[in-house]
Amino acid sequence: MDNRKRLAYAIIQFLHGQLRHGGLSCDAQESLEVAIQCLETAFGVTLEDSDLALPQTLPEIFEAATSSKQEMPQDPRAPDRTPPSEEDSAEAERLKTEGNEQMKLENFEAAVHLYGKAIELNPANAVYFCNRAAAYSKLGNYVGAVQDCERAIGIDPGYSKAYGRMGLALSSLNKHAEAVAYYKKALELDPDNDTYKSNLKIAELKLREAPSPTGGVGSLDIAGLLNNPHFITMASSLMNSPQLQQLMSGMISGGHNPLGTPGSSPQQSDLASLIQAGQQFAQQMQQQNPEFVEQIRSQVVRSRTPSASHEEQQE
């Protein structure tokens, strides 16, 4: 028999009971009568269909369900909060230490396996999850790293390294807004950490300025530079410099560069003169258009990737 009809009958039975004994106002009683009529029409059920009655009334079923709530089995996905034995804790630490050694040897897959074994023995240790996140990042599994960092933060919300490694993984996934938030949290917990400061700055730059699709190596916008009138003007000025023309002429002819220092080889003199010309060009750019120089500097910083130097130190 259709259980929906049984359920509808139980509800209608309950509403009729409320009409008789509920002590309701006239308006409330009228509303219940309308509700009963709607249910009877929708399900084709009336109170006379006693064959649909259940052994228990709806209030009795509800009371039984709420009273047994505490006896429901635990969600199997919930972490086991039973403290590990001393033997398991010691073995988990040994596995973690061995995993750290494998990280130093760049055996990242082995490290993931060892940290996983440590987690099986002691799933309440945030360090194990955070260390495995670092190994996952080394393997390019940034999604796995994010998940392990989330577990570590769930266990220990004050663990700064978990936030820092989360920022690294999110940056690698180009989720710079989220990375910025996690780097800021890491700095709140460890305000003197220079790596977090540097990575936060890089993530903020990447968030503000998306790399140009025509950018060159390292996402430096070469096309933009070549089309910038300030850059063209200063480059033309440099190329028309008598000093640079004399230098280039000497390098092409293979002769000694008169700009070099006495006693130095032609190659050394040419190199020193070329460096000097480059420095003069940079100074000229800084004096004539400091905003443009800052733009170039920002592009160079933006092209860098966050550093994991501090994060590579496993605990």
Curated annotation (Swiss-Prot):
GO cellular component labels: cytosol; membrane; nucleoplasm
Comp. bias intervals (Basic and acidic residues): 72-84, 91-100
GO BP annotations, alphabetical order: ERAD pathway; negative regulation of ERAD pathway; negative regulation of ubiquitin-dependent protein catabolic process; positive regulation of ERAD pathway; positive regulation of ubiquitin-dependent protein catabolic process; tail-anchored membrane protein insertion into ER membrane
Phosphoserine: modified positions: S85, S303, S307
Region (Disordered): 65-100, 249-270
GO MF annotation: an example: BAT3 complex binding
SUPFAM superfamilies tied to this protein: TPR-like (SSF48452)
Keywords noted in UniProt: Acetylation, Chaperone, Cytoplasm, Nucleus, Phosphoprotein, Repeat, TPR repeat
Cellular localization per UniProt: Cytoplasm; Nucleus
Main location (coarse class): cytoplasm
UniProt keyword Repeat, yes or no: yes
InterPro entries from the UniProt entry: SGT, SGTA_dimer, TPR-like_helical_dom_sf, TPR_rpt
Residues carrying Phosphothreonine: T82, T305
TPR repeat windows: 92-125, 126-159, 160-193
UniProt xrefs under Gene3D superfamilies: Immunoglobulin FC, subunit C (1.20.5.420), Tetratricopeptide repeat domain (1.25.40.10)
Modified residues (N6-acetyllysine): K138
Family label: Belongs to the SGT family.
Function: Co-chaperone that binds misfolded and hydrophobic patches-containing client proteins in the cytosol. Mediates their targeting to the endoplasmic reticulum but also regulates their sorting to the proteasome when targeting fails. Functions in tail-anchored/type II transmembrane proteins membrane insertion constituting with ASNA1 and the BAG6 complex a targeting module. Functions upstream of the BAG6 complex and ASNA1, binding more rapidly the transmembrane domain of newly synthesized proteins.
Subunit architecture: Homodimer. Homooligomer. Interacts with DNAJC5 and DNAJC5B. Interacts (via TPR repeats) with HSP90AA1. Interacts (via Gln-rich region) with SLC2A1. Interacts with HSP90AB1. Interacts (via TPR repeats) with HSPA8/Hsc70; the interaction is direct. Interacts with BAG6 (via ubiquitin-like domain); interaction prevents interaction between BAG6 and RNF126. Forms a multiprotein complex, at least composed of DNAJB12, DNAJB14, HSPA8/Hsc70 and SGTA; interaction with DNAJB14 and HSPA8/Hsc70 is direct.
Name of the molecule in the record: Small glutamine-rich tetratricopeptide repeat-containing protein alpha
Organism: Mus musculus
Gene name in the database record: Sgta
